Amino acid sequence: MPEGIHLTSMSELLTFEEIVQVVRTAAELGISHVKLTGGEPLLRRSLPTLVQMLKNIEGIEQVTLTTNGILLKEYLPTLLKAGLDAVNISLDSTDRDTFRKITGFDQLDMVLAAIDAACASGIRTKINAVSLDLGEEAMWNLIDLAKDRPIDVRFIEMMPIGHGKDFPVYSHTKMLELFKERYPDLTADKAMHGFGPAVYYHIPGYQGSIGLISAIHGKFCDKCNRIRLTSTGFLKGCLCYNTGADLREILRANEAENEKRRHLTETMEAAIYAKPRAHCFESAEDVTERATMNEIGG
């Protein structure tokens, strides 16, 4: 977690019941997959209860979680019982010192234990690593997590949002060239790995796969099927812009429930149809979003 972040009071956060109202409306509008992200979602007390509540909504086919992994092993049995379908674990380095510098905590062992626990449980597991220029050895060590584990190790181009603006974007074109040099038998993996934009590759002899999510150098906005709901109830169509809709204001309005449901549906539908055609991260002056990723969720 970066230093100097804005801490949100509990009164500003959507309650579980309010989140369920939004997701139920989203399901009525045709959305079927939900991912709980952060910040760190497992810091939210009783999160497995929310997972179960979301799984019980008609039309919701899948609920997944993105976590830093530190609390995952502890909560995994309860999450599985609640019906969690898959988990993404954020891990940028397997080197203890580098991990501590990035996260501020010396808890790499807990994350690695969580990865093994997730694999042992059978839940679909992916590793999300932001593509930082930490040297080739760091990259190979991350990829080797997929050697004896049935997981996807995915490299994600740094998004120039919040603290991400302070880092150069590490090109996946260069990264793929390095992959092919080290693994000459690397092949494209055409198997279905989910509903996201990652392009996957397989190394012979490895149980898992490698994925590249190239938001900057491999722009996939024409295929983007996502909207984001912040913890405070703001619905966003694109990470690049500060546009969207304040759903918390509607959820807490003093009006009849049927009017509130109608207002919520109309507002969400309008926000979805107003989703920008493409991001503008190539042109920094056009980016209007000022929040950090931990505030937005991702």
Predicted features along the sequence, with ranges:
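Radical SAM enzyme [4Fe-4S]-AdoMet core and its adjacent flexible, acidic
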Residues: 97-100, 105-209, 215, 249, ...
